[in-house]
């Protein structure tokens, strides 16, 4: 079993949780550089957009009514795992979802707050965006 590098517990409002998750991930990311002529292009090994989308999905689709079912983020040397005890909508497999994405949040008020707060788009394309970034 792989060992993760660090852990933290975040107890804050929804938007502060989002920021804390993103900051936690960035804290452990490495910069990779590409030098082309005189231009140096440095970027995180995992793009910021991927971290944002995965963090939003983690919070939006969390099972909020059970403290025993807490989502988590584990950072390993070769990957980041965003784990949520929630499930895909009834009758939808991950493969089906990739073919026909749609938004079906467990808690519409949480999804609405993130949408109205300008951090989520509400179309159900977050996972697809992760694969294309």
State each model region's role:
Residues 1-19, 46-133:
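Conserved beta-strand-loop-beta-strand hairpin that lines the nucleotide-binding pocket
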Residues 9-40:
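Helix-hairpin-helix/helix-loop-helix acidic hairpins
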């Amino acid at each position: 079993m792989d060992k993760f590098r660090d852990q933290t517990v975040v107890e804050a409002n929804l938007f502060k949780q989002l920021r804390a998750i993103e900051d936690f991930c960035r804290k452990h990311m490495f910069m990779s550089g590409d030098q082309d002529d005189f231009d140096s292009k440095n970027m995180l090994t995992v793009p910021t957009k991927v971290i944002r989308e995965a963090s939003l999905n983690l919070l939006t689709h969390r099972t909020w009514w059970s403290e025993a079912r807490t989502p988590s983020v584990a950072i390993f040397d070769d990957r980041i795992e965003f784990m949520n005890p929630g499930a895909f909508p009834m009758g939808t497999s991950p493969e089906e979802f990739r073919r026909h994405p749609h938004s079906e949040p467990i808690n519409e008020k949480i999804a609405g707050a993130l949408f109205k707060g300008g951090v989520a788009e509400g179309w159900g394309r977050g996972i697809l965006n992760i694969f294309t970034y």
